[in-house]
Structure formats: C-alpha cells, structure tokens
C-alpha cells in the first residue's frame, strides 16, 4: 500500500510523537511532585494531624528568657594577629555601638 520511504517516515513521525508525549507526561509528573512538596513545606508545623484526636491540645514551646549579658572584653586586650594594624572599635559595654 505504501512504499518503503513513506513507511519509514510514518515510523519516524510516530516515534517522535510517542517520545514527545512521554516527555510531556514526565514534566507534568515532576511538576506535580514539586508543587506538592512546596505546598506541604508552607503549612505550619503545629497543625493538627487529622488522624489524631481533634480535641487534643497543642502545647507550644516556652520562650527562653535571656540572661543578663556579661561585658565583652576590649579588642586591645585580645588582639590575635600581630601583623594586623587597627582592629574595629571594641565593645567593652554591651550597649556601646548599638
């Protein structure tokens, strides 16, 4: 019915069509997986699992109260490198430089 040249062209065209459909499907599946992973990453960590008891209370972490900061040593007392000229201004008092 068809000559050899036409059969070869139909075979090449069908192979390219199948390859294009497979690549489109692969890209679509990867897009779905990435969008699902990004959507799950945006959800808050303290949400309630639907499999657990809905009346369960969420216990939040208590804030850590910062202790009073001690004074930092002056930069002249703790210079590390001999070849370095002047170091940045030292902060002997925690409020200095703020």
UniProtKB/Swiss-Prot annotation:
Q: Report whether Secreted shows up as a keyword of the record.
A: yes
Gene Ontology CC entries for this record: extracellular region
- Where does the UniProt annotation place the signal sequence? 1-29
Instruction: Give TM regions.
Output: none
Chief localization: secreted
Keyword check for Signal: yes
Keywords (A to Z) from UniProt:
Secreted, Signal
- Put simply, this protein is called Protein FAM24A
- This chain's source organism reads Mus musculus (Mouse)
């Amino acid at each position: 019915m068809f000559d050899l040249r036409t059969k070869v062209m139909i075979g090449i065209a069908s192979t390219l069509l199948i390859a294009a459909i497979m690549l489109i499907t692969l890209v679509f599946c990867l897009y779905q997986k990435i969008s699902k992973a990004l959507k799950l990453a945006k959800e808050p960590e303290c949400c309630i699992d639907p499999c657990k008891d809905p009346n369960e209370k969420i216990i939040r972490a208590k804030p850590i109260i910062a202790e009073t900061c001690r004074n930092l040593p002056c930069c002249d007392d703790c210079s590390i490198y001999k070849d370095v000229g002047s170091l940045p201004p030292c902060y002997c008092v925690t409020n200095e430089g703020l």
